[in-house]
């Protein structure tokens, strides 16, 4: 999800073919390296923010008009428990997920007077590659 030009063009391409979008589910995320913030590589920090936050902002900009063309549009964004808890060593990932949640909540409030249903989903512990990367000793 860090192909910003592709994301920006996505809305137009969907419009050309279908004119609307009924549902969006955004699950794009990368973990980055867990560790002290002062040890986090700048490029990796920015990459995590770009994938987990900035790409979703661009996606919202690209597809909101398409969602509004639908009868009962829905947009859901997957988040994480670390978005709501301050945990050491989770740096860019936690920051990006907390920021994503705030952005989605703001977008939801901005669309309160229309029929666009916007939600944040926290799936909890899920046996994924990212979960195994973050918790290598955990039994899944």
Where do the language-model regions lie?
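A short helix-coil junction within the Rossmann-fold of NAD(P)-dependent oxidoreductases
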Residues: 17-18, 31, 35, 62-71
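Substrate-binding pocket helix/loop in short-chain dehydrogenase/reductase
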Residues: 35-37, 41-49
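Active-site "substrate specificity/gating" loop of NAD(P)-dependent dehydrogenases
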Residues: 40, 86-90, 131
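A short, exposed helix-loop element centered on a Lys and neighboring polar residues
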Residues: 60-61, 105
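Short, flexible catalytic-loop segment of classical short-chain dehydrogenase/reductase
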Residues: 123-133
């Amino acid at each position: 999800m860090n192909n910003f030009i592709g994301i920006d063009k996505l809305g137009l391409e969907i419009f050309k073919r279908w004119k609307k979008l009924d549902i969006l589910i955004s699950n794009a995320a990368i973990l980055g390296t867990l560790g002290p913030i002062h040890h986090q590589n700048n490029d990796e920090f920015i990459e995590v923010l770009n994938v987990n936050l900035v790409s979703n902002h661009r996606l919202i900009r690209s597809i909101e008009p398409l969602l509004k063309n639908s009868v009962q549009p829905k947009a859901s964004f997957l988040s994480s428990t670390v978005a709501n808890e301050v945990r050491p060593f989770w740096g860019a990932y936690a920051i990006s997920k907390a920021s994503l949640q705030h952005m989605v909540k703001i977008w939801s409030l901005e669309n309160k007077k229309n029929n666009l249903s916007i939600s944040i989903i926290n799936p909890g512990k899920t046996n994924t590659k990212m979960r195994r990367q973050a918790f290598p000793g955990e039994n899944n």
